C-alpha cells in the first residue's frame, strides 16, 4: 500500500475546473473579467506535490531520451537536484491483441476519456495503419506513450516533438491598451498584473488558424515534389501567391529546413527523401513563459510579458529558449507542471471548435498512488482552455509520411 503524499497548497481557491462546462481559450480565460482564475493542473487532476515533482522529472527524462543532443535545463536558483531518482514507478502498458476492440470512452463537457490500455486498442483499430494495414503498437511505441501527454504526440508523430516550427497570435495593441487603461486587481502586484495582461493578449484560436493555414500551404507545395529543391520552389511560389511574410524567411530558417530535419523523411519506409510522400501535421504545446533562470524571480512566478511572443508578420515563435522549465511557486507548497502536449494531426474539419485534440493526464503508473494514465480527446475549446500552470500556447507543424494513418482527415471523439 502507498500512503498519500503531502497535498499541494493550490494557487487558486474555488477555481474554475477546466474539465467541466464551457471554457474560453487560455488567453481569453485569463482576462475574462469575471474575477475567476483558471485552476492548476494538479488541482484539476487531484495530484499531490510529490505527483507534480514526479511528472516533471519524467517529462525531463523523456526529453533526454527523445532529444539526446539538447542541453539539460537549468535548475532555478532556489532549487536543488531532486532528492530521489526521477520517478521509478512508470510502467510500459502491456501489449493489446490487434483484434481486440475498444470499450466506450467516458464523455463529459467536450471531453472523452479512457485508460491508456483502451486507447491502445483504439489506436490499433484506427490510427495504426501503415500502407493501409493495421499494426500492433510495438513495445517501443508503448514505451513512448507511457510518458503521458508528450507520449501521445510522440507516438503519433514518430520522433520526440522538437517544437521548432511553432506559431502563435499576440495582439500588441490589446496588450498596450490594457496596460494603459486597466488597473491591477486588489492585492495584485505589478508583476502579476503585467503577466496576466500579456497572457490575455494571446489568442489560441488565431494561433491555431495560422498554423493550419501554413500547413495547408506546405501540403500544396509537397504535391508532385519528388525532391527537396522542387518542394522549396513550390513553397516559395505558394507564399508569393498568398503574399505571405514567411517568404522572407532566411533559407536556413526552421521554416525551410523543417522537412529535411524530419527523421521519417529520410527513412526508406517513410518519405525516402521524396517530399510528395510526406504531409504537414499539427500538434500543440502549452508551457510557461518565465523560464529565464537569470532574470527576475517575479517573472518566473507570474510570467514574462516579453517571452515567446510570435513575430508579428509571420506568426513564428522562437522556441529556442524553451527549456520546459515549470512556473516557480509564489507560495510554499505550490507546484506547477512544466508542459502539456495535444495531438491534432491533419483533421479537415473547418470549424476549430469541432476539432479533437488527443492528450494524456500523466505518465502511466498503475501500481502507485498516481495511478494509470488516462487519454483525453478534447474539443478545441476544452484543449485551449489550459491551466494556470501555463501562459503560452504554441501550435506546431511537423511532418509524417502519408502512408501513416496517425493523422487522418477525420477524428471521431471517443468510441461508440
UniProtKB/Swiss-Prot annotation:
Modification comment: Predicted to be exported by the Tat system. The position of the signal peptide cleavage has not been experimentally proven.
Classification via PROSITE patterns: TAT
Region (Disordered): 64-103, 290-331
GO molecular function, one term: protein-glutamine gamma-glutamyltransferase activity
The protein's enzyme class: transferase
Cysteine pairings via disulfide bonds: none
Catalytic residues of the enzyme: 149, 340, 359
Signal peptide range in chain numbering: 1-29
Biased composition (Basic and acidic residues): 86-103, 295-309
Ranges of biased composition (kind: Low complexity): 76-85
Catalyzed reactions: L-glutaminyl-[protein] + L-lysyl-[protein] = [protein]-L-lysyl-N(6)-5-L-glutamyl-[protein] + NH4(+)
Enzyme Commission number(s): 2.3.2.13
Assigned keywords, A-Z: Acyltransferase, Signal, Transferase, Zymogen
A Pfam family assignment: Transglut_prok
Job of this protein: Catalyzes the cross-linking of proteins and the conjugation of polyamines to proteins.
Record-given protein name: Protein-glutamine gamma-glutamyltransferase
Origin species: Streptomyces cinnamoneus
Amino acid at each position: 500500500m502507498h500512503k498519500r503524499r503531502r497535498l499541494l497548497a493550490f494557487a487558486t481557491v474555488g477555481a474554475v475546473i477546466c474539465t467541466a462546462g464551457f471554457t474560453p481559450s487560455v488567453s481569453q480565460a485569463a482576462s475574462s473579467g469575471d474575477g475567476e482564475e483558471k485552476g492548476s493542473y494538479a488541482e484539476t487532476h487531484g495530484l499531490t506535490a510529490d505527483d507534480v515533482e514526479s511528472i516533471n522529472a519524467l517529462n525531463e527524462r523523456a526529453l533526454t531520451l527523445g532529444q539526446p543532443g539538447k542541453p539539460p535545463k537549468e535548475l532555478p536558483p532556489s532549487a536543488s537536484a531532486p532528492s530521489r531518482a526521477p520517478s521509478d514507478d512508470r510502467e510500459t502498458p502491456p501489449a493489446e491483441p490487434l483484434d481486440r476492440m475498444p470499450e466506450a470512452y467516458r464523455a463529459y463537457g467536450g471531453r472523452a476519456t479512457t485508460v491508456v490500455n483502451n486507447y491502445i486498442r483504439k489506436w490499433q483499430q484506427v490510427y495504426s495503419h501503415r500502407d493501409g494495414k493495421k499494426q500492433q503498437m510495438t513495445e517501443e511505441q508503448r514505451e513512448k506513450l507511457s510518458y503521458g501527454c508528450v507520449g501521445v504526440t510522440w507516438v503519433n508523430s514518430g520522433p520526440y516533438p522538437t517544437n521548432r516550427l511553432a506559431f502563435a497570435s499576440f495582439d500588441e495593441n490589446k496588450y498596450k491598451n490594457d496596460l494603459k487603461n486597466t488597473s491591477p486587481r486588489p492585492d495584485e502586484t505589478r508583476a502579476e498584473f503585467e503577466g496576466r495582461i500579456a497572457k490575455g493578449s494571446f489568442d489560441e484560436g488565431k494561433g491555431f488558424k495560422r498554423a493550419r493555414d501554413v500547413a495547408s500551404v506546405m501540403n500544396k507545395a509537397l504535391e508532385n515534389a519528388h525532391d527537396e529543391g522542387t518542394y522549396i520552389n513550390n513553397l516559395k511560389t505558394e507564399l508569393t501567391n498568398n503574399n505571405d511574410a514567411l517568404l522572407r524567411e532566411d533559407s536556413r530558417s526552421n521554416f525551410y529546413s523543417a522537412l529535411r530535419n524530419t527523421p521519417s523523411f529520410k527513412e526508406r519506409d517513410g518519405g525516402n527523401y521524396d517530399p510528395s510522400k510526406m504531409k504537414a501535421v499539427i500538434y500543440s504545446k502549452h508551457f510557461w513563459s518565465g523560464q529565464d533562470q537569470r532574470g527576475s524571480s517575479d517573472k518566473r512566478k507570474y510570467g514574462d510579458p516579453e517571452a515567446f511572443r510570435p513575430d508579428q508578420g509571420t506568426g513564428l515563435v522562437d522556441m529556442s529558449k524553451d527549456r520546459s522549465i515549470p512556473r516557480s511557486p509564489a507560495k510554499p507548497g505550490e507546484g506547477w507542471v512544466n508542459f502539456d502536449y495535444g495531438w491534432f494531426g491533419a483533421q479537415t474539419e473547418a470549424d476549430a471548435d469541432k476539432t479533437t485534440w488527443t492528450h494524456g493526464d500523466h505518465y502511466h503508473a498503475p501500481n502507485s498512488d498516481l495511478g494509470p494514465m488516462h487519454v483525453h480527446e478534447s474539443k478545441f475549446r476544452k484543449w485551449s482552455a489550459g491551466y494556470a500552470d501555463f501562459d503560452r500556447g504554441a501550435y506546431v507543424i511537423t511532418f509524417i509520411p502519408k502512408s501513416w494513418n496517425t493523422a487522418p482527415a477525420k477524428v471521431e471523439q471517443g468510441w461508440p
